Amino acid sequence: MKTYIVGGAVRDRLLGLPVRDRDWVVTGETPESMRRRGFRPVGRDFPVFLHPDTHEEYALARTERKTARGYHGFSFHAAPDVTLEADLARRDLTINAMAEDENGELVDPFNGRQDLAAGILRHVGEAFVEDPVRILRIARFAARFGFSIAEDTQNLMRFMVDDGEVDHLVPERVWQELSKGLMEAQPSRFFTVLRDCGALARILPEVDALWGVPQRADYHPEVDTGVHAMLVLDQSARDGLGLAARFAALCHDLGKALTPAELLPRHSGHEGRGEAPTRALCERLRVPAECRDLALLTVSFHSHIHRIRELRPDTVLRLLRECDALRRPARFDDLLAVCRCDAHGRPGHEQDAYPQIAIARRYLDAAQSVNAGDIARQTPDKSTIPYRIDAARLCAIEAAKRQIS
């Protein structure tokens, strides 16, 4: 029985990064012999086993053959005569097609170490075109490592898009890769890589439509709305925001792509126009409710937060109510954090003060200071309880506004 550490564990060790998960490939064995050795089968589509002691995954060396379009359109062949090199040849990128034997010797038939040192993402072979998920993975690795993409690989990605292969990606897998891409160090690279090969227009047309839409240069020195969206997204990564907040940053200005041409470069009403494309994107990709809801709140109310010092107390109360801020203060904090990224996502404004967060929290604290239970107990006519609670909260917000002013 010969075992090899493969893929990301080898790559990350060579990069000097922490190795979190180790995947193993086994040659010269069968499913029956693996079970006799105490390995527990867990693979549904191909032979994968858990080690009896470490519980790490061990997969029999295998080859694969394309049988239909899309991510699931493959058949696999695993047998004792499948070599390690044959198994590595089916992998996506040279930097992921390396292995180490039990003595720590590197097995590198496709010069992955050389590409790793040069910072290049390069496909292993022509079979790359058979799996559209690989386009998303390349975009994700570009966002993680900042690597460039080999010209031949870029050409293959464009071919896959033109051939319609990406149109067969299942929503769950797109979201899986998108959510990982959003959490990388430079998430904008994920989207620009997809845009450069034409995949963004097929997978996320609502986002792709932002490029080429102008904004007022006095507010947005970057002018282009797509560029602004990427600046905001990268700011959310620098600020260490979570997945829901980063997704909200991506979606916050989707309505600007729908601004009538005669209004440009102004975008009055873009908040309302942004709801439909955001909902469409979320429904199509089956985005989790936490991410969807924060994105919709950000789309609808980011301009309110930017102008919160100017808002009337009754408008502030309505904002807090529609954001469900009294019951969901942590989510409201996420909204505020995304709005700060929006303000900072403009060249020359990265370090600007953003007092709106402190003001919004002051208003929320004022509204929360009202004891709704006491009001309810002291109100004989129970039908007026909501009105009296709102009136008390409005008075508290008015007092806070006077102090802020």
Curated annotation (Swiss-Prot):
Binding site for CTP: 8, 11, 91, 137, 140
InterPro entries: CCA_bact, HD_domain, NT_sf, PolA_pol_head_dom, PolyA_RNA-bd, tRNA_CCA-adding_enzyme
Record-listed E.C. numbers: 2.7.7.72, 3.1.3.-, 3.1.4.-
Superkingdom per UniProt: Bacteria
Reactions accelerated catalytically: a tRNA precursor + 2 CTP + ATP = a tRNA with a 3' CCA end + 3 diphosphate; a tRNA with a 3' CCA end + 2 CTP + ATP = a tRNA with a 3' CCACCA end + 3 diphosphate
Free-text comment on the cofactor: Magnesium is required for nucleotidyltransferase activity.
GO molecular function annotations of the record: ATP binding; CCA tRNA nucleotidyltransferase activity; cyclic-nucleotide phosphodiesterase activity; magnesium ion binding; phosphatase activity; tRNA binding
Keyword terms of this UniProt record: ATP-binding, Hydrolase, Magnesium, Metal-binding, Multifunctional enzyme, Nickel, Nucleotide-binding, Nucleotidyltransferase, RNA repair, RNA-binding, Transferase, tRNA processing
One example of a Gene Ontology biological process annotation: tRNA 3'-terminal CCA addition
Pfam families xref list: PolyA_pol, PolyA_pol_RNAbd
Misc. comment: A single active site specifically recognizes both ATP and CTP and is responsible for their addition.
Family: Belongs to the tRNA nucleotidyltransferase/poly(A) polymerase family. Bacterial CCA-adding enzyme type 1 subfamily.
Domain notes: Comprises two domains: an N-terminal domain containing the nucleotidyltransferase activity and a C-terminal HD domain associated with both phosphodiesterase and phosphatase activities.
Cited function: Catalyzes the addition and repair of the essential 3'-terminal CCA sequence in tRNAs without using a nucleic acid template. Adds these three nucleotides in the order of C, C, and A to the tRNA nucleotide-73, using CTP and ATP as substrates and producing inorganic pyrophosphate. tRNA 3'-terminal CCA addition is required both for tRNA processing and repair. Also involved in tRNA surveillance by mediating tandem CCA addition to generate a CCACCA at the 3' terminus of unstable tRNAs. While stable tRNAs receive only 3'-terminal CCA, unstable tRNAs are marked with CCACCA and rapidly degraded.
Protein name: Multifunctional CCA protein
UniProt organism field: Laribacter hongkongensis (strain HLHK9)
Record gene name: cca
